[in-house]
Amino acid sequence: MPGVLAMILAGGEGTRLQPLTITRSKPAVPFGGSYRLIDFVLNNFVNSNILRIFVLTQFKSQSLYMHIKNGWTVNGIPGCFIDQLPAQMRMGKRWYDGTADAIYQNLTFIKHNDPEHICVFGSDHVYKMDIRQMLEYHKANNAELTVSAIRVPIDKAKAFGVIQVNKKGRMIGFEEKPKNPKHIPGDPEHALVSMGNYIFKADILYRELERDANNENSSHDFGMDIIPALYPKHKVYVYDFLTNKIPNEKNVGYWRDVGTLDAYWSTNMDLLTNKNLTLNNKSWALHTYYPPLPPATFLNYRNKQVSIAQSNISAGCEIVGAKIDKSIIGFNCKIGPGTEISESIILGEAKIGKNCIIKRAILDKYVEIAPGVVIGEDLEADKSRFTISPNGIVVVPKGAKIGFE
């Protein structure tokens, strides 16, 4: 799409997702068996025919770098690219210092592409969005900044930027992560919050970033600094995510922030139980890096019948005489006879021995489980070995070898 440049903020450290983010950045965390979190925003841009994309990386970016390098390319299409921009200290000996500073440090690359409109989007939310529709709304209002927004329960709003709008959709109030969020007029149970997706007129963004960079008291963050400075004096409009339409899908406002282990687990489970999150819409294909693996194999073993119910099983898996229920199994996992896995996420490359029990757990990549190990039945016992989320999800770190002592 001419005149439009996408900037994806993908430097998130994701401390609340540890141990899943010990060796990778938050956008690189695997999701749904075959994807990574960043795939959702990349698909939103590509499916919207916005094919000039910069991905800004910083923390533990090697896993993310390889995923994008291997799985995302628009080579051969003139003027189109998906390029990664790691922190390069172009503005002095410092890393990206806030979301706004990350864009500011890359103004040279942005201006070289001479865009009229610049999309600044996050990379760690699960949702589908035709960004062209938000862009049309932005242009129709001659907005200098447009912020996408969604309704959330009032008790959850304090984790987001809370917005007030007038009847024409113009922003008239904004508070970043307030202690006492303001509800939507006439709806005391909900607040309108920012999704962290912005479309700027290029000249406005340049000017505001320069102003912010020279403010020693700024945290250089879009939510904390840029938006509060803009909306009182400039045309800042709010795009209602509920109006967005994806072909062959009904939009009920499915959008998830997977910033915690419990949110990550429940959003993965939505793939199995929530019809509002689907991966098989051919009209809105979800691309990713797909390794060259054979189809999954399911084998009975003596008197042990393999059983798979309400689960997603990825390529390369070999499941022998095991029972899998309400679970997501990533690439190339080997699961032995007599093992029972339920309400769990196995991120890939796991080796799980025979007669194991795994319940309500997340196993990171390259985990090896000895025969007979039980995980998730006794949380008190599990606390001495693993991370336990507030809702009782057991998390086994990458590369762990369990039960071989």
Please place each PLM-identified region on the residue numbering:
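Conserved core of the sugar-phosphate nucleotidyltransferase
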Residues: K128-D203, R207-E210
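Active-site-proximal specificity loops/subdomain of glycosyltransferases
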Residues: G79-I103
